[in-house]
């Protein structure tokens, strides 16, 4: 089909190549012989062979033999005979330059190889492979808000003598002041026994007060062993139990108008009976006057 276009170009190129060779000019090395592809050349060769074989009896048959149409892509004839038949005139007609179509196809340069695939990217080692961590999600870093407000800082600065913890009482105060800054202190971290300040009032629950009152009525003075037992039972310290009993004895003295607290339970009972007798006498005196 395309021989009408390829053959004139081929003849012109041959003439130009001969003229260039006579003038001493170099021919483009990228040129290759423009023969047909084996499939196209095979089609024309099969048609020429059929014409040679059935040429004498083709006039009596209106149609071509069915074998020619049964195979759309016939294989090329053997290399011993020509492409156009026994004398090879069909081959010379379609390929005047000589050589078989298979040889011309093999003489053509191979297509360039495909470029190798790019190597896989290295495994990601965290956020480092994505650039800056600040711009990882397209947002800037959030500004950290200060923990303390100006009012809280002012309150903490008022107590520079506070220590970082109550367990460092035996250490040097100068060393503690240098190691701990006021911005790291919280109100609940302040020790109870700070110098120059009054201690907060200790509050007792209803259950603790009731148990302490029972113990006081049983014995106003506690031994060391009993004080430890009471402090463990009520989840208090020995010092808190000791102070509570001291305050309770002072209260009893004020209520009974006595300078000395009774040592034994018998003295307590005697004092109560005397107090009841005095109250009865006062009531009788008021009744007589009325």
Swiss-Prot record:
Residues 197-256 bind DNA. SUPFAM superfamilies: Homeodomain-like. InterPro entries: Antp_homeobox_TF, HD, HD_metazoa, Homeobox_Antennapedia_CS, Homeobox_CS, Homeodomain-like_sf. PROSITE patterns: ANTENNAPEDIA, HOMEOBOX_1, HOMEOBOX_2. Keywords: Developmental protein, DNA-binding, Homeobox, Nucleus, Transcription, Transcription regulation. Residues 60-69 have a biased composition (Low complexity). GO terms for cellular component: nucleus. GO terms for molecular function: DNA-binding transcription factor activity, RNA polymerase II-specific; RNA polymerase II transcription regulatory region sequence-specific DNA binding. PANTHER family: HOMEOBOX DOMAIN-CONTAINING PROTEIN (PTHR46166), HOMEOBOX PROTEIN HOX-D8 (PTHR46166:SF1). This is Homeobox protein Hox-D8. It comes from Pan troglodytes. The lineage of its organism: Eukaryota, Metazoa, Chordata, Craniata, Vertebrata.
